[in-house]
């Protein structure tokens, strides 16, 4: 916890003041901290738009490393808690395994990108002029595979392959509720609610809505829960989470779209959703990436997979 005694002669917004004190904090991290009651102004939770002035006391309940206060010998990414786990690597790309609970990038010290850079640095393979670049994203609470490009050519190839749906993405998840039918392909439309930070699923198209397609099949059931294999055909924000919730089967542990009573009962901190498999097309015309043709990469099965299979989690 850090306690700040404001000495500003002119009133300034709380969020601007905190970002001036801790440059590594961005708007997203501040909003999350406020939602989690980790920011107090004069002992009370206040909106980030509140103006602070001389004499005010601000307390922020974040770790020193989250505030960028730990001394570093070397690049800032060494503050990441651990080096990344690589599922696969060649001269063009890295397939990294992201744990649930860390963002892929952003202002925090412990991100997937920083873990990747830390691993390369510790193995004396880090090139500051040509660092690897993220080609897609996962939500903070989602675990699983993320592609990073080592070259600009690989970045273009991977981003375009994802955009054109040439790389098949398969997820594993546990839902609260058994979907009926046990296997289906869902077609809907999605709009963003930027004010509340969520998306909404619609049955019919409307202005600004984007088509979403999600396929699923049931691997196993345990009590009120179902273990699903999900194919992400389109890749929109929160698509799997919102789409499954729209049919009455929210993902276990999901605080935005899920059953919070069940989440509390089972003491789940993050959504039970894993980006489990990335499958490249059987034919790749570009000779620079032909070695990837037909390759399938898989993350280790998440902890909840076996617990649903054997009935421990139900």
Q: What name fits each language-model region?
A:
Residues 1-32, 79-84, 206-210, 223, ...:
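Pseudouridine synthases involved in rRNA/tRNA modification
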Residues 1-194, 221, 298-308:
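RNA pseudouridine synthases
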Residues 43, 223, 228-231:
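Short histidine-centered loop motifs in beta-beta connectors
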Residues 47-51, 229, 270:
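Short, surface-exposed secondary-structure edge patches
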Residues 67-69, 196-199, 211, 257-262:
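Short Pro/Gly-enriched beta-strand edge/turn motifs at strand-loop
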Residues 216:
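Long C-terminal interaction/binding lobes of large macromolecular proteins
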